[in-house]
Amino acid sequence: MKSRKEMRSWLDDFNLNHPLVIAGPCSAETEDQVLKIAYDLKNTDVSIYRAGLWKPRTRPGMFEGVGAIGLKWLDKVKKEAGLLTATEVANASHVKLALEYDIDVLWIGARSTVSPFIVQEIADALKDTDKIILVKNPVNPDLSLWLGGLERLYSANIKKLGVIHRGFSTYEKSKYRNNPEWQLPIELQNRFPDIPLICDPSHIAGRRDILQDISQTALDLNFDGLMIETHTDPDNAWSDAAQQITPDVLVKMMEGLKIRTLTSDEADYKNQLNTLRTQIDVIDHGILETLGKRMKVAVSIGELKKKKNVAVLQTKRWNEILGNMILEGEKKGLSEEFVLKMFKAIHQESINNQEKVINS
């Protein structure tokens, strides 16, 4: 699969002067709820109305969606509110039903993207379709799986493709529900610059208070659109209540986002420069996050050394680390001088932290 300009044609056809906005409830709950939200979104920047009908939940016993009956409600949304409709599909049966009700946009969820078997089943069921098909990143940070999903769909003669970045699961404590790991969608964008890239800040955040910040970062990284879970009564939503916002809040949030526009070669240069600088900011934050984790491990080592009455400085171990890192640095185009300075500073901070533990 090669990046082609026509991959963006479905997005260009919207002729928008703002990022694409996909919004609607995490789950369709009742017909009244679905239509009420749709009416509230009708005269906003929202182009596509989303609602989950089949909900793949982590554990059984939780609300798993209303199922096929919700397709009738989405049909009413299209006819009465004039919005395009979107829902998640996880197997060939879902695809068949969604196509029967003329759903405009189908997305493959994170739990499905991890399985080539599921993606292939969906691709076979969608073969030759002219519907817009979006692929969410897999649950785990694996770019090959994400690209593999796109390639299977492309091989089934599906040309209207896009990707949704919803973050990645992690065992580590984080302010995010799913860590953004921005470097992965950036890498995908670098390889396939013509595939529309949409951010799902709702699933990255898992809470309302950081939705705008995540959305702004996505736009600064040149994402083409946002998918935001929206509900008229989010606190009482049947699923993912904490991350949903009202249509009014969505409108205010969109008004508060800074959206860059290109009007000249100079603007194009500034846009590209801003995107690259944002990428550096994301990477720098990742470096600090990693260094913080490293220092926590160093403190744990200090506690163990204190318990066993072992000296802080272990010269043999330090020389091994330095030698290995210099070799690794050379492979990545980093000079020996730079690697030495950096790891000496890191090592000194580790020693300082361990000495604090031992002397406490």
Q: At which residue positions do the language-model features occur?
A:
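Active-site mouth loops of central-metabolism enzymes
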Residues: 19-36, 60-65, 84-88, 109-110, ...
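N-terminal small/glycine-rich loop or linker at the start of catalytic domains
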Residues: 8-26, 57-60, 189-199
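Hydrophobic faces of well-ordered beta-strands that scaffold small-molecule active sites
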Residues: 20-25, 47-51, 85-87, 106-108, ...
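N-terminal amphipathic alpha-helix/helix-capping segment at the start of soluble metabolic enzymes
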Residues: 1-22, 76, 255, 265
